Amino acid sequence: VHWTAEEKQIILAIWAKIDIEEAGAAALSRLLVVYPWTQRYFKNFGNLSSPTAI
């Protein structure tokens, strides 16, 4: 994909509004709850046995 300069600026402006820490944590939590088999890839994270623990 080849973005124009204007499209690149729009994309950067949208991503600048996102709280990466919060969105990343929420996305990872949903991943581990909705697809519990993915927990095996994150064994170093500790207790992932329930949504509350995650």
Swiss-Prot record:
Keywords: Heme, Iron, Metal-binding, Oxygen transport, Transport. One of its GO terms (molecular function) is haptoglobin binding. It comes from the Eukaryota. One of its GO terms (biological process) is hydrogen peroxide catabolic process. One of its GO terms (cellular component) is hemoglobin complex. Residues 2-54 form the Globin domain. Belongs to the globin family. Hemoglobin omega chain is an embryonic-type beta-type chain found in prenatal and neonatal marsupials. This is Hemoglobin subunit omega.
